[in-house]
Regions:
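N-terminal helix-loop segment corresponding to the beta1-alpha1 unit
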Residues: 1-182
Length: 182
């Protein structure tokens, strides 16, 4: 038995939230990764085991100890399945675009009536109501918006900062998501 044994987490596949799911799974929570029909996009991220593109070490690293289910959220039947899955969960992890969950009838207002005890963790780059909420985002833009790159690189700040490696912006957000759940 581990610290989070007995907790069920539903994670909507996204590289922005996957590390939070990994941390919860590694602590013993049952994490169910919801993937689109073509699979989590990170399944195609390098590096690959023996250069085989169907064996992504990146995907394996971020999804250890997770279960997986494929749902086509463009269909009503799979949207119902998602709502039923979330209704049985303790925690929902997602980083969906602002209006996506409302379109699926899976926003907090709907989900909280299905499961009043649900902990809904929405890892969004600029929140849900900020004027920048709909802007595209990458790990690099998150880091730049937060300021850490200016402390990376050289003492001479007339030189450009050095980009950190390894999805540091996503990891920082996921650490805070993980701590918020605990």
């Amino acid at each position: 038995m581990t610290a989070l044994t007995g907790l069920r987490v539903v994670e909507l596949a996204s590289e922005r939230i996957s590390f939070a799911g990994k941390l919860l799974a590694d602590m013993g929570a049952e994490v169910i990764l919801v993937e689109p029909p073509h699979g989590d996009p990170s399944r195609s991220y390098p590096p690959f085991l023996e250069d085989n593109p169907s064996q992504s070490l990146y995907f394996w690293h971020y999804n250890t100890n997770k279960k997986s289910v494929v749902l086509d959220l463009d269909t009503n039947a799979d949207c119902r399945r998602l709502r039923n899955l979330i209704a049985s969960a303790d925690i929902l992890l997602e980083s969906e675009p602002i209006h996506r969950l409302a379109e699926l009838r899976c926003d907090y207002d709907v989900l909280s009536t299905l499961n009043p005890q649900l902990i809904h963790v929405a890892l969004t780059p600029y929140g849900r109501t900020n004027p920048m909420s709909d802007l595209p985002v990458t790990d690099l833009t998150l880091m730049a918006a937060g300021g850490p790159p200016w402390s990376c690189g050289y003492d001479d700040h007339s030189l450009p900062p050095v980009r950190g490696w390894g999805n540091q912006g996503y990891h920082t957000g996921c650490h805070f998501a993980y701590m918020s759940v605990l």
